Amino acid sequence: MNTDKLALIKQSIKTIPDYPKPGIMFRDVTSLMEDPAAYQATIALFVERYKDLGVTKVVGTEARGFLFGAPLALELGVGFVPVRKPGKLPRETISESYELEYGHDMLEIHTDAIKPGDKVLVVDDLLATGGTIEATVKLIRQLGGEVEHAAFVISLPELGGEHRLAEMGLSLMTLCEFEGE
């Protein structure tokens, strides 16, 4: 990968200490999007990786996955499918719950958004524990979609998401890693 682009991307991500609670180092990708060169570099690196893999749909998870998934889908010339929190999608949906640090949450997808045999790329801004993406992949597979790849701007490797998703058979691309810095 282009090391200059990767450096630009990582430098553009601001770290906010003690947000949303004490002890958390929040990685803010909205600062990346404020820099057009960094945002373009992010999408360009994803396009370079996935342009020849036969992807037919890009799925983005609520909400920041939309910010990277939709422009990537346009560049690849394929459809974009949002995966959302309950009650946000107007047509018939299926849902999948997943565990959070303290409790659980749920995601939904339109039942007609993925067709059997679709080759789906899942995109999100950040990979932490992998719970959100695991639930997303289960939804896609339930609809007959094939998911082999997931792409992230940021990975927090110490939280175990990479291992969790590898166990699901996913090949991962992350542009930046942050270790408890």
Swiss-Prot record:
Subcellular location: Cytoplasm
Catalytic reaction annotation: AMP + diphosphate = 5-phospho-alpha-D-ribose 1-diphosphate + adenine
Keyword Cytoplasm among UniProt keywords: yes
Pathway: Purine metabolism; AMP biosynthesis via salvage pathway; AMP from adenine: step 1/1
PANTHER family for this protein: ADENINE PHOSPHORIBOSYLTRANSFERASE, PHOSPHORIBOSYLTRANSFERASE DOMAIN-CONTAINING PROTEIN
Record's function text: Catalyzes a salvage reaction resulting in the formation of AMP, that is energically less costly than de novo synthesis.
Subunit structure: Homodimer.
Family under the similarity heading: Belongs to the purine/pyrimidine phosphoribosyltransferase family.
Protein name: Adenine phosphoribosyltransferase
Organism expressing this protein natively: Shewanella loihica (strain ATCC BAA-1088 / PV-4)
